[in-house]
Amino acid sequence: MHVLLLNGPNLNLLGQREPGIYGCDTLATIETELTREAKADGVELVCFQSNFEGALIERIHQAMGESQGILINAGAYTHSSIAIRDALTGVAIPYVELHLSNTHAREPFRHQSYLAGRAVGVVSGFGAKSYSLALSGLVHHLRQGG
């Protein structure tokens, strides 16, 4: 099973940017740990991060025929990108939206997600553990025939 992990804008700054909200783990640390967890579960995880909407969309398109599932932390694009939603809808690959922080406990503009309505599920608010929980949920969904 092949799963694509997508991380959006500013997530390359994890560990430095607002640690009180996002925690102290770097993106590299999160990706390394999640890759280890995935491998132990028989899943090949490919990680991609970009601060650019078009690059994320291109990577979603490339996942067609290669990935059975997508994990996506679109960062601020969650609340603004119809284009990313359309790309995810267009490739028809099951995906889980995830966030480090509980977006519903933050500013009102973060309460809306353009991605959640088409997602298999949403995980938020558990810090770096959100990635592991999202992977577990997606793999379970895919193995159940989703």
From Swiss-Prot:
Substrate binds at N73, H79, D86, L100, S101, R110. The keyword Lyase applies. It comes from Synechococcus sp. (strain CC9902). HAMAP family: AroQ (MF_00169). Keywords: Amino-acid biosynthesis, Aromatic amino acid biosynthesis, Lyase. The record marks R17 as: Transition state stabilizer. Transmembrane segments: none annotated. Homododecamer. It comes from the Bacteria. InterPro entries: DHquinase_II, DHquinase_II_CS, DHquinase_II_sf. Belongs to the type-II 3-dehydroquinase family. Pathway: Metabolic intermediate biosynthesis; chorismate biosynthesis; chorismate from D-erythrose 4-phosphate and phosphoenolpyruvate: step 3/7. GO terms for molecular function: 3-dehydroquinate dehydratase activity. Catalyzes a trans-dehydration via an enolate intermediate. It catalyses: 3-dehydroquinate = 3-dehydroshikimate + H2O. The active site is at Y22 (proton acceptor), H99 (proton donor). The gene is aroQ. Its EC number is 4.2.1.10. NCBIfam families: aroQ (TIGR01088), PRK05395.1-1 (NF003804), PRK05395.1-2 (NF003805), PRK05395.1-3 (NF003806), PRK05395.1-4 (NF003807). This is 3-dehydroquinate dehydratase. Pfam families: DHquinase_II (PF01220). GO terms for biological process: amino acid biosynthetic process; aromatic amino acid family biosynthetic process; chorismate biosynthetic process; quinate catabolic process.
